Amino acid sequence: HNFTDDPAQVTDYTITISGLRRDLDFLRDRGYVTILPHELAAGQLDDGAPLPQKAVLLTFDDGYVSNFTLALPLLREYGAKAAVSLITARIDEGTSGFLSWDECREMAKSGLVEFASHTHDHHIHNDANGIERRNGESEDDYLTRISYDLETSITRIKLETGQPVTAFTYPLGKMEPWAEPVLQQLFSVTFSGV
């Protein structure tokens, strides 16, 4: 999720940048190769080569500014790739601590970062988290709401970065059976985990 220079700021979702460096050293030293979601979906690397036997995805959720200020320089140093799952409303609103579209564009130009959807605006609410149904919500209302949210996220990412969106990351790892047909229609790859 998030990165820091200050060990006192480490949480369940924030690691030190030196911790990321150790992780990247670990992967490199054991022969792992980072890939992007679109490469996973295609079953091959961009140059047409088959996926490496030790392919691995690095994923950073939410779109914190530290993905740009701290993680991107390390990705460049190691030649490592990562997927950054964006909550696009936070960027549109200029929420403090989150990426800006200018930063996203620079990350996209690096060729090392691919953006995934992490919803537009339905990340955490009182009656539902992520893409969960709201209490008493009909299936039709749910599908209309979630389709609009996900399509908005895809549109914002494509418009601002020029990247197609092939992946979705479930917020908080919360899945919803009603969402599956929509997700299958919109995305080639989905991720879950906390």
Protein language model features and the residues they cover:
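Short, acidic/glycine-rich phosphate-metal binding loop used to engage nucleotide
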Residues: 40, 61-63
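Conserved beta-strand segments of alpha/beta enzyme cores
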Residues: 33, 114, 188-189
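Conserved beta-strand termini and adjacent loop/short-helix elements that scaffold enzyme active sites
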Residues: 37-40, 85-87, 118, 193
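Short, electropositive alpha-helical surface patch
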Residues: 173-191
